[in-house]
Swiss-Prot record:
This is Protection of telomeres protein 1. Disulfide bonds: none annotated. Keywords: Chromosome, DNA-binding, Nucleus, Telomere. It holds the Pfam family POT1_C_insert. The keyword DNA-binding applies. GO terms for cellular component: chromosome, telomeric region; nuclear telomere cap complex; nucleoplasm. It comes from Gallus gallus (Chicken).
Length: 778
């Protein structure tokens, strides 16, 4: 039977393996050697879903770990046919896997996954045999697990990390950003670790599932990461997620129970590792200062940033860019607090409880990227809100005292974010015990000495004419910084000297250009010039002119690239030459390949960009290939054409690309390519003129933005019909055609004024900055 399941009795397989088989070490698995009568044994640490190949054959891949080798201690095993189907039903992480009759082949993914340079190929047709020693049903980490089944992992100290490796490690959290939604669909968390070597490692972790990221609650927590890929950047080692990434997190307090917070349902944790956690705790207590700026509401002061552990008792939508959280921690703020006016129908939470706690709760206004998570929170849950800002605001009315506002600003700087704490968290258990002892009687009957009540508890919008009222009106744009600045009316802006910066609130009366594709320009940051984006006909004209020159055969198939030439049937036998850049004298997969093309049309080049990493149009000269005129793109990648500035560029020899090809893992980033070729790259930018009004004045402000305002890359808008439609819908929302001025949405913007000299005249211009369209506008 090709696949056999063996029971483990007293740490050994119930059935003995055939006597002619001898165990092979991982380090001896090489192509060209005879592995007949040999078997390899390892622990299953990762398995992939069963799939079918193009011909319908079942395919199953697993990763085995061998603890006899310390540096690269894992290898891929590829199974085909019925053997793949059978193993996919039986195998679980932690099983002992024994394979004989395997074929050893080079692994094309070794550089990417950091595993063995070879992989094992297994199938029933080739006479392979598999023995699986299944582990008992999965138990919690604290229960006994057979030592013969539990894999023994090797952990790398932070001062021994090497570029390109995939490692397991332990570390103490020195800084972290709570998970947030990245520009794509994944969640992202940033963690900076340190260990006894005093070396720091910053890890950027991505996952589509929030629960699969480390459950870190505060600085000083201890983490165990499995399968972190190490990359060197600017001389510093950095960690990123790789396939099979998993984590455990522990409270870093000396003497606290060693209870892991796991990112996966199945994991191993042995006594030896408990000792590692305790050693890290003791070292951190003596050598690190990792306590965060935690505070209770009774300790807050104006103009401070702090972390708050609290319970959520109410929440409400405020406008397109902010969300209200009503929280308490059982203590009383010593200052009057701002109560955000919201409509009763918008407020979620127990009305009776909210009324009882009205003098103990504070209103935290959450902005921008934190809004989505805030909306999903359940009332009654326990939170840790990181980097809350307390701001003192003066009342407009003499009968009302100044008050404190609580803000969680947008962005993730300084670890801003919201963490949801489980009920068994020690800090939550302590808070719950404290809240149960809080006497509400005094709070209920006391006149609001410490709280600024703008109307009744569940009143509608206040009638006060103040910025607090105006902020409730839907704003179609979001401020990405400087939220502390107060609004300035346009009349004051227009009557003030330049240069200055302002926060304004206005409506978009009109904008130019009306044809939105005309707003995309090319900008040189060095000489600060703008130019139009060349159209396809202009580029084709340049390419056709170069195609008239025959390729130079002496420049084909050099040491660092391989060339292919063919002749077209049309265009009088036009010759096309493609030069494939090699890496370590080998051709790469298409998705990793840079190629250069001579004699191709724009249509042909676009076809190549769909399959290959990037394409550079070139032409032959006597002794070298060279770039085309910079009126044409010097590089095409995906749907984007990259241009260079004619004025600021000093084109260098195309041979300089070979220096990038010699890198361990060439990234072929456009900025790197431009640098070695002596090109000053032009950047795609939106340039528009907005006419803004607020009832006190009319102001023309220019939008000069690469991608932040529309949250659309200017580089992609011309080739992506979906993004074009999104931009058009956005502008129709900001300035709906045919609508009265009173019906237009408000825009909150930052603008800066600057002087421009025109001969003897000095004119003041205005530019929008640090502003973006609200997420729910389109």
């Amino acid at each position: 039977m090709p696949v056999q399941v063996l029971k483990i009795i007293k740490g050994k397989p119930e059935t003995q393996l055939p006597s002619h088989l001898q165990r092979e070490d991982l380090k001896h698995l090489q192509t060209g050697l005879d592995h007949t009568n040999k078997y390899f044994q390892g622990i299953v640490i990762l398995s992939y879903p069963l799939t079918k190949l193009g011909d319908g054959t079942d395919f199953f891949k697993i990763v085995l770990q061998d603890d006899t080798c310390s540096r690269i201690n894992s290898i891929n095993v590829l199974m085909y046919g019925k053997m793949a189907e059978d193993c996919a039903k039986l195998i679980r992480n932690g099983d002992t896997f024994i394979v004989a009759g395997f074929k050893v082949a080079e692994s094309p993914t070794a550089r990417e996954d950091g595993r063995h340079a070879c992989h094992l190929q297994v199938s029933e047709e080739s006479g392979s045999a598999i023995f699986i020693c299944t582990q008992p049903s999965i138990t919690p980490f604290s229960e006994a697990t057979s030592p013969s089944v539990a894999p023994k992992y090797v952990y790398t100290p932070l001062n021994c990390l090497k570029d390109g490796t995939v490692v397991n490690l332990y570390g103490i959290v020195k800084f972290f950003k709570p998970p947030y939604i990245s520009k794509g669909t994944d969640y992202c968390s940033v963690v900076t670790l340190v260990d006894q070597s005093n070396v720091k490692l910053t890890c950027t972790l991505f996952n589509g599932n929030l629960d699969s990221l480390p459950k870190i609650y505060k600085n000083g927590d201890i983490v165990r990461f499995h399968r972190v890929k190490i990359r060197e950047y600017n001389g510093q080692m950095q960690g990123i997620t790789s396939a099979g990434f998993a984590s455990l997190t522990f409270d870093g307090t000396v003497g606290a129970p060693v209870v892991p917070r796991a990112s996966s349902k199945v994991y191993t944790f042995v006594d030896e590792e408990q000792k590692t956690v305790e050693e890290l705790r003791i070292w951190a207590a003596s050598n690190l200062s990792v306590s965060g700026p935690e505070a209770k509401l009774s300790d807050v002061k104006p103009m401070m940033f702090f972390d708050l552990t609290c319970q959520l008792v109410g929440k409400a939508k405020v406008d397109g860019s902010s969300f209200l959280l009503k929280v308490w921690d059982g203590t009383k703020c010593p200052y009057p607090t701002w109560k955000v006016p919201v409509e009763a129908k918008e407020l979620e939470g127990d009305r009776v409880l909210l009324h009882h706690l009205r003098n103990l709760t504070v209103d935290v206004l959450v902005y921008d990227n934190h809004v989505q998570l805030a909306k999903s929170l359940k009332t009654g849950s326990f939170l840790r809100i990181y980097s809350i800002h307390t701001k003192q605001a003066s009342a407009k009315n003499e009968d009302m005292s100044s008050h404190i506002e609580f803000h969680l600003h947008g962005g993730t700087c300084y670890g801003r974010g919201i963490g949801i704490l489980p009920e068994n968290n020690p800090d939550v258990e302590e808070l719950k015990s404290f809240l149960e002892c809080v006497e509400l009687t005094d709070s209920q009957n006391m006149e609001s000495v410490s709280s600024l009540e703008l109307g009744d508890t569940f009143d509608s919008y206040t009638d006060l004419e103040s910025p607090l009222q105006r902020c409730q009106q839907l704003s179609a744009t979001v401020l990405t910084d400087h939220q502390d600045m107060s609004n300035t009316v346009l009349k004051t802006v227009l009557n003030s000297s330049a240069p200055q910066q302002y926060r304004i609130r206005a409506k978009l009366r009109s904008f130019k250009p009306q044809k939105l594709y005309q707003s995309v320009k090319l900008h040189c940051s060095k000489c600060n010039t703008l130019q139009e984006v060349p159209n396809g006909d202009a580029i084709d004209f340049i390419l056709q002119g170069c195609a008239a020159t025959a390729p130079n055969p002496e420049l084909q198939s050099m040491s660092w690239y391989e060339s292919v030439v063919w002749t077209t049937e049309e265009d009088q036998g036009r010759k096309i030459t493609i030069h494939f850049v090699k890496h370590y004298e080998m051709l790469q997969r298409p998705e990793n390949t840079l190629l250069m093309i001579e004699g191709g049309t724009l249509k042909e080049i676009w076809k190549l960009t769909r399959r290959f990493k990037c394409v550079i149009p070139v032409k032959s000269k006597e002794d070298d290939l060279e770039l085309l005129d910079l009126s044409a793109p010097f590089l095409l990648q995906g749907n984007i054409k990259y241009y260079g500035c004619k004025k600021c560029s000093t084109p260098k020899s195309i041979k300089n690309l070979s220096s990038l090809a010699e890198k361990r893992e060439p990234s072929w980033e456009p900025t790197e390519i431009a640098q070695v070729l002596g090109i000053e790259p032009l950047q795609y930018v939106f340039v528009m003129k907005f006419t803004l009004v607020d009832g006190t004045g009319v102001l023309n402000a220019y939008l000069f933005d690469y991608e932040k305002f529309f949250q659309i890359p200017a580089s992609e808008i011309l080739t992506n019909s979906f993004l074009q439609q999104k931009m058009e819908m956005t502008m129709n929302t900001l300035s709906p055609p045919g609508r009265k001025l009173d019906d237009l949405p408000w825009l909150e913007c930052f603008i800066k004024s600057y002087n421009v000299a025109d001969g003897m005249k000095h004119q003041v211009y205005y530019q929008i900055f640090d502003t973006t369209v609200a997420e729910d506008v389109v």
